[in-house]
Amino acid sequence: MLSSEIFSKLLLSKGFDFYTGVPCSLLSGLIRIIDDDPQTPYFPAVREDAAVGLCTGAYLAGKLPVLLMQNSGLGYCLNAFTSLNLIYKIPVLVIMS
């Protein structure tokens, strides 16, 4: 089993440096570790589509974004992914519980 601490270090080693998402109890360990590390800013979002927008802005500003969310939030962000990220080929790593 991969711990949240090891996983967060792997993400950092791959250059991911911007994190956002809707808080989720299943991802709370990873969110806590990321939020406590000054190298990995975490910005909580109120909805998944808003988090997609934050990731897009971060990518355009030179960051490598990660979106953390529950699987139930996928429907909320499909329009943002298809009308923004897909069209302009803006990558976002999605970690879904």
Name every feature range the model reports, one short phrase each.
Residues 1-97:
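Thiamine diphosphate
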